[in-house]
């Protein structure tokens, strides 16, 4: 197993309502504790405003620049995840940062630009906190996703929302470029990554192998067969 700094790309061919509702469903499950949950959303410029509006309409809170700075200094301290935010509600995390949000806020979203580790929002956060990036085009989106995976998610999970029929070439390139053992398409990444309900292609498990990319001997979801000596 390993860290899962999961990026989710929303292509301009995506069903925006499906994408946003899936990400919220995933990120609020167990308050973002599942390591396959989305840590960053990368949205193509053409649909960025529509995606932002959909997140806001569904109870997510977009931090202004001042609030973003307060939250970034709360989620990561001295280069490490602040244990006080792990699995907490969005409103609780906001309060820790001195930011006031509606009590029912589902996710805190920081609109950021850098994918470097110097950007706190680019880290794995294990809480209902998301980074949101604007991508100029699909190549820019792929590049950002690759960088975020390199920041701390090699071998784990990556996700994309698009029309898989019309944009098969994009999907094939995404699958080929992302160094993750789970490639999820139009699927909530928490539930899709752990298998079963949303993804019958994966063995149900909360222990997710990251393969040689993540320094693991197993690349699939770990089950009882991996505990048997043969």
Per-region residue spans from a language model:
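ALDH superfamily catalytic-core signature
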Residues: 1-116
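Conserved C-terminal structural/oligomerization subdomain of aldehyde/semialdehyde dehydrogenase
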Residues: 99-230
